[in-house]
């Protein structure tokens, strides 16, 4: 399977940079020259500064309108660069990594997603977005809600990562994001690395594309890992990966259309009876009743690793909370704005104009009404 990871904005390029570390094909797009220079693993010729004529290379200060305009202005440059990387080989999936709460990522990613769908109709466009932390305040929440709406119209799937679920207590925002980015890449890279790999029962690119072609709905990744020597019930470990504690989004899995499960570990632990017991349970839970699976026995492994992907999700508390908060704020803000305008009008209504208070030059027949020249002389 061929995938191209495209990082957009500060958050997105940091995530893409970690994908580059584990040998994925990547490209970075940002409005901040400094953020692009900070990257460690994406080659310099694949780092593109966009919107320089608007921002001077200093970023958009979390303003999605500027992020959108920056992407629009330099979209021909971006698409040419992507075309030079893609060449004549098909790309199965474009993964766009970004932060829902930022400016360049939130504003620019929907623009790029739409352009990629038009240019490469046989490829999937999947957005991988980090939802903002509660501590970041209202502005990132509003950015996220609007971006969710826009991406749902152009992307095949939106893999939303709820940072609030992954953040460990006591972490500040900076260190929390660093850990979260590593977690996102580790889990998704683990899944992609197993596609088209020989196994007892394998997943291929068409399986993954089928699961992710989900009409702009949400998808989430689940994960569970344990020391093989301590696994007493493999079925329970698999189920843990798609229950709330294992998922990266607070979602109702019963609303999912499709599922995909990849299991990797020593052969003596990967018992077929345990695996099918767990998969039968998952099949009974999700609405679409379609589960793709891959089993990868490896005698060199000491751990059992389970990666789950659920797609076609329309019920998520994480998403619903963001959208509801943004709507409530919008109503409150518009009401406050209307009240402020009304009070301003009430306060200032009835004031005279200057012409009502001071006689005009024409009315006095003088070039110096009211003796202003004399006043200026005295003031000296």
Swiss-Prot record:
* GO molecular function terms noted in the UniProt entry: GTP binding; GTPase activity
Record GO cellular component, one term: cytoplasm
Keyword annotations for this protein?
A: Cell shape, Cytoplasm, GTP-binding, Nucleotide-binding
- What Gene Ontology terms for biological process does this UniProt record contain? cell division; microtubule-based process; regulation of cell shape
Residues annotated as transmembrane:
none
Per the record, the similarity remark reads: Belongs to the CetZ family.
Q: What does this protein do?
A: Involved in cell shape control.
The entry's protein name is Tubulin-like protein CetZ
Q: Which organism is it from?
A: Thermococcus kodakarensis (strain ATCC BAA-918 / JCM 12380 / KOD1) (Pyrococcus kodakaraensis (strain KOD1))
